[in-house]
Swiss-Prot record:
UniProt keyword terms in alphabetical order: DNA damage, DNA repair, Hydrolase
One Gene Ontology term from the biological process aspect of the record: base-excision repair
Keyword tRNA-binding found: no
Name the record gives this protein: Putative 3-methyladenine DNA glycosylase
Family, per entry: Belongs to the DNA glycosylase MPG family.
EC number assigned by the record: 3.2.2.-
Gene3D superfamilies: Methylpurine-DNA glycosylase (MPG) (3.10.300.10)
Signal peptide bounds: none
Length: 188
C-alpha cells in the first residue's frame, strides 16, 4: 500500500508544495505516474490564476480545502489536473504538467503537458473537487525519491504574470525504473 499525502502536506505554502510534489506518484485508477513538472497558481493577486477574478462557481474548489482536485477544461477540449494548496479560504493550486507514466508491461513513457496527462489517464471534470487525501484510487503518494535538483522557469501558456518563475521541472529526466515496488530515479 502506498502512503497517500495528507492534508497537512497540501496546507503548506504553494511553492513548497510544488517543489515537494516533484518525484511523488500520481495514482489514478490503474495508472501510476511520477510527477516531473509542476506549476503554481497562487492567490487572488496572481493574474494568471483562475482565482484572480474572485470566488465563482468554477473557482470555489480553489478556495476550499487543501488536497482536493481542481480539474477544468481549457480551449474547450483539454482537461487540466491541479491540486488545491494553502489553508482553506486562500485560493491556490498546483498544476500537474508532466509525469513519467509507469507500466509493468511497457516502457515508461514521459507525458508532457497537462492536457495529455488527463487524456491518457481519462481524468475529466467529473474528477473535480475530489479529496485526494482520502481516495485510494485518485491520490498522490509519497515515494522514496528525494528531488533536490530542479529548476524554476516562467509558467507556460499564459499571457499575464509571466514574470513569476513558478514552473518547477526536474531537469534531464532520463529514466525511472520500477523495482520491487520501490522507485529509483536516474537523473543526468
Amino acid at each position: 500500500m502506498y502512503n497517500i499525502l495528507k492534508k497537512s502536506f497540501y496546507k503548506q505554502k504553494s511553492l513548497d508544495v510544488a517543489s515537494s510534489l516533484l518525484g511523488k506518484m500520481l495514482l489514478f485508477n490503474q495508472h501510476k505516474g511520477i510527477i516531473t513538472e509542476t506549476e503554481a497558481y497562487i492567490g487572488q493577486d496572481d493574474q494568471a490564476a483562475h482565482s484572480f477574478h474572485g470566488y465563482t462557481k468554477r473557482t470555489a474548489v480553489m478556495f476550499g480545502n487543501p488536497g482536493f482536485s481542481y480539474v477544468y477544461l481549457i480551449y474547450g477540449m483539454y482537461h487540466c489536473l491541479n491540486v488545491v494548496t494553502e489553508p482553506e479560504g486562500f485560493p491556490a493550486a498546483i498544476l500537474i504538467r508532466s509525469i513519467i507514466l509507469l507500466s509493468k508491461n511497457t516502457p515508461h513513457t514521459k507525458v508532457n503537458g497537462p492536457g495529455k496527462i488527463c487524456k491518457i489517464l481519462h481524468i475529466t471534470k467529473e474528477h473535480n473537487n475530489i479529496d485526494m487525501t482520502a481516495n485510494h484510487s485518485f491520490c498522490i503518494c509519497d515515494t522514496n525519491l528525494n528531488i533536490d535538483d530542479y529548476i524554476c522557469t516562467p509558467r507556460i501558456g499564459i499571457s499575464k504574470a509571466t514574470d513569476k518563475f513558478w514552473r518547477l521541472v526536474i531537469p534531464n529526466v532520463t529514466s525511472l525504473q520500477y523495482i520491487d515496488t520501490k522507485l529509483v530515479c536516474t537523473l543526468t
